[in-house]
Amino acid sequence: AFSYGVLEALKRTEIENKAGQTLRLLDQIDIITGVSGGSFTALAYRLYGDKLFDEYEKRFLKRDVQGEITRRTLNPANWAALSSTGWGRSELAANLYDEILFDGATFGDLRRSDGPYVAVSATDITSGSRVIFTPQNFDFLCADRGSLRLSRAAAAPSAVPVVLSPVTIN
């Protein structure tokens, strides 16, 4: 909610440039970084632009997302998948995030829209080091960032150990 409030304040704040034109401060932002809950806001703003302000609260902020994840975890229909290797509660959460917020969008979809560059950070659980979801880092991993669903990118930095499983990037 904090990151969304910051974007709202930047949207409302007007500045005057040297030519005397009034501009929104939000339109002057070149990069947005996000970690944990802020990754949802950063990615959604990059995907939707100003439409975010019409839909984000209803679609995401004011929903009981934790409750929905818990209900899905307790649903016997999901138990086989949850007990398999390579698929865990974070994948279940990412599927929910797709349904309620990201609509299956990938990093590749972000290339087709205007807006600030978005850098989402997570933690590599094996080394404890920070991983920033940049093209360069994905090239190093020999992974295709363009096909990575935004929902999985948002799930990675919010994957609290024990509560949500780590997100694996192949």
Feature locations, PLM:
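Generic, well-ordered alpha-helical scaffold segments in large soluble proteins
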Residues: 9-13, 100, 157
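Secondary-structure transition/capping residues
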Residues: 17-18, 108, 165
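Active-site gating loop/helix substructures
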Residues: 66-83, 95, 112-170
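Short, structural beta-strand-to-alpha-helix junction motif
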Residues: 24, 100-111, 149
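Short, contiguous clusters of charged residues that form electrostatic/catalytic patches at enzyme active sites
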Residues: 4, 8, 95, 99, ...
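Patatin-like phospholipase
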Residues: 2-87, 91, 134-137
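Glycine-centered secondary-structure boundary/capping sites
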Residues: 14, 101-102, 106, 126-128, ...
